Amino acid sequence: MKLPIKFAFASIFLFLAAGCATPRIVRNIVEPAIPSYHQDINGVPMRRVAVLPIDFDQQTESTPNELDLVFHAELTKTSAFEVIPISREELHAHFGIPQLSSVEIIPSDLLVRLVQDYGVDGVLFTDVTHYFPYRPIAIGVRCKLVDAHTGVQRWVFDHLFDSGAPQVAIAAKQFAVDQESEQSPIATDGADILDSPTQFGKYVAHETYRSLLGI
C-alpha cells in the first residue's frame, strides 16, 4: 500500500533529522561526600567548647593521640568556637577515665566540673567507630556536641568515610590538592592521601567538623 505523499515526506524528514542530530552525552557527575547531620538552632551560640579525647577502642597507644592532634587541628580551623582540648590525663585525673564515648552515660558531675574549671558553653564528644589504616583506608566517626549548661544535644554526627567509594576518594584527593596548593607550588593529584591514614584522617576531620558551622 502506498503512503500519501505528505506522510512520505514527513517520514523522510524525520529520518534525516534523526541521522543529523547530535547524540546526547550523559555524564555521571560524582558529588563529594557530604555527611548528614542534625543541629538544634534554638540554643545559644557556642563560644567555648571543651573537646574530650577521641574514644578509640583499638589496642594501640600512638594512634588515639595522633588522631586527637589531627582532629583538634581541623576543628580549630573551622573557627566555629574556641576549642578547649581536654587531655586524657586531665580526664583521668578528674573522672578516672581516659576517654568517654558519645553514647555512654555522661557522669553526673562532668558537665558541672567542665563549666566551673574551664568556663565552657559546650562539650564535644568524638568517637572513632571504625579504623582500617590500609588501602582502601576507612574511618568511621561519631560525634555529639552537648550544651554544658542544660545537657541538651546541639549537634550529632555519624558517618563512615570509606576511600574505596569513588566519591569519597575524589573528595579526599581534592582536599589534598587544596592543602598542597597552600603550602607548595608543586602540582599534585592528591592521590597520596589514599595511602596515608594520617592524611586521610585530616580529610575525615575536615568533613566532620565542617558541618559544625552555624552552631
Name what the model sees in each region.
Residues 20-45, 110, 114-117, 136-138, ...:
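C-terminal/domain-edge helix-coil "capping" segments
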Residues 46-52, 58-123, 202, 207-215:
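N-terminal segment of the mature soluble domain
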Residues 48-53, 123-127, 140-144, 156:
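Soluble periplasmic/extracytoplasmic beta-strand elements of cell-envelope proteins
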Residues 1-18:
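Sec-dependent bacterial lipoprotein signal peptides
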Residues 60-62, 130-137:
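Solvent-exposed loop/turn segments connecting transmembrane beta-strands
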Residues 127-130, 161:
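Residues that line or immediately flank small-molecule/substrate-binding pockets and catalytic motifs
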Residues 130-132, 145-149:
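Beta-strand elements of well-folded, non-transmembrane domains
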Residues 92, 132, 163:
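Feature marks short, surface-exposed loop/turn motifs that line or immediately flank catalytic pockets
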